[in-house]
Amino acid sequence: MMSFLKGRLAGNKGYTIDQTILIVAIIAILITLIIITVGWQLITRSTGTKLAAQLRQIEDANGQFYSQQHMWPYQAQSGTATGSSNMAALANQLASGSWTNAVDTSQLSNLIPGFTSSAAGVTQPNGGAVTEVVNTVDSVGLGSGKFIVVQFADVSLGDAEEADKAIDGEDDNKTGRLVYQANACTGATAMPTISAAPSNGTVNVCYVANAVQ
């Protein structure tokens, strides 16, 4: 009888040791899951914001180049300008004979520090190629006119989404200054109609930067 009463009293006092251990373990697991989820969101948001800053850095570099040379990088080359050579011009990686006579070579410098550059072109920190061309942009809802459009290749979808929010205020991959899709988002003379974003993987991100006309 005494043992029965002791058991009842112990049961009325609260959880058993085994139950307490189980509850503590469950709480610990839930806290870990929350930390992992929130941490990943913060990391993605941070890298997306960094991507937006890198795109704006190139836009600013174009403006600085124009201020110094009174022409855009694509106009400063003696040969046919390409998306890669335009970026090489910003990084001062073109061969000396590749500039037009109108360029003041004493003013040339690397205007995009932080990017890996060579005569072949420029890559972003994650290794994807960076190019820029002049395109019309009416297909992305920005009206008429010609702009320098910067493209980053092989960007993670999450980074593209967060960069879109940072630049356009919302994640809409088809319109605005920042768009992205699985295929290239620049064309020979005009930006293409942007397709729906993939559900995962990497994308090409395009940023409508400086107005040239």
Predicted regions and their residues:
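Short, surface-exposed interaction loops/tails
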Residues: V140-Q213
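Extracytoplasmic low-complexity repetitive segments enriched in small/polar residues
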Residues: L33, Q57, M71-Y74, T80, ...
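C-terminal juxtamembrane segment of a hydrophobic transmembrane alpha-helix
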Residues: D18-T20, V24-S46, Y66
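Membrane-proximal N-terminal amphipathic helix
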Residues: I43-P73
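Intrinsically disordered, low-complexity coil segments
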Residues: A10, S78-S85, A188, A196
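Extracellular/periplasmic head regions of type IV pilus-like filament subunits
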Residues: M71-E161, G169-D172
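N-terminal leader/signal peptides at the extreme start of proteins
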Residues: M1-I17
